[in-house]
A protein has these predicted regions:
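Short phosphate-binding loop-to-helix
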Residues: 96-118
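Short, acidic/small-residue loops that bind anionic groups at enzyme active sites
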Residues: 145-161
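Long, charged alpha-helical interface segments
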Residues: 160, 165-239
């Protein structure tokens, strides 16, 4: 497998956008019910991963057809397409990895691990929020997992971007309009500074048990958030 630059993961939560921006060398992973979004948006995923408990018909049948139309490659646990049976499937040929329903990793985390093994260090997750609350929380924790393992992760929906920073800074262009919320994650965050926003912070402490950094506002200046010691969950919501 060639080393990828970005991994685009399409999950099974709420998707309120009509287009997902892709680059030619992106690794695109459909997670369980996220395969339905791929079909609707006419995206061909490189791999489909999941136990498929959230994938409804007719898409569940399509995945089964994809599995039936493939033979396992020697030494691999997943399945791939052969030239003889490529036309047997009604959908584009992708790799299918069916997971056990009882497992430690969520389907999304399995997709993250797949992307990291492929060499990706930048992850963009769509339809990763909404739906079941526990999966939204798990996906927010996944952002911290990525950061602590040398990668960057972003959750996107129609009106927001969510990411995590650790002992570093993040900036937003001066044309940004909307709301910026900042939360301590995984423990207290020390030395938090926010500039270029309506409410300024300088070398502050954000406690993991109190939402002090919610609903700041962009004011037409370049905005920067930094933390000296700890991790911050950053949520930018635009208008």
């Amino acid at each position: 497998m060639e080393k990828c630059q970005r991994c685009i993961i399409i999950c099974a939560g709420d998707l309120e956008i009509s287009q997902i921006p892709l680059k030619e060398d992106d690794l695109v992973v459909a997670v369980d019910g996220g395969y339905m979004y791929c079909r609707v948006l006419e995206i061909t995923p490189d791999v489909i991963i999941g136990d498929f408990d959230s994938l409804e018909e007719p898409y569940a049948s399509e995945v089964r057809e994809l599995e039936a139309a493939r033979v396992a490659e020697p030494g691999e646990s997943d399945v791939s397409c052969t030239s003889e049976n490529r036309e047997a499937a009604e959908v584009e040929c992708s790799r299918v990895i069916r997971l056990e329903r009882e497992k430690d990793d969520t389907d999304t985390m399995a997709a993250i691990r797949y992307g990291m093994q492929a060499g990706c260090r930048e992850f963009h997750l769509y339809a990763a929020m909404g739906g079941r609350l526990e999966h939204t929380i798990a996906n927010l924790q996944t952002l911290l997992f990525l950061k602590k393992n040398g990668a960057k992760g972003y959750l996107w929906d129609a009106f927001s971007m969510t990411t995590v920073i650790c002992n570093e800074s993040i900036s937003f262009r001066e044309s940004m309009e909307g709301i910026l919320s900042v939360f301590a994650m995984g423990g207290d965050a020390k030395g938090v500074t926010e500039t270029g926003l309506k409410y300024q912070l300088q070398d502050a402490l954000l406690e993991n048990s109190f939402p002090k950094g919610i609903s700041n506002e962009f004011i037409g200046e370049e905005a920067t958030v930094s933390v000296k010691d700890g991790s911050l969950l950053i949520l930018a919501r635009w208008e």
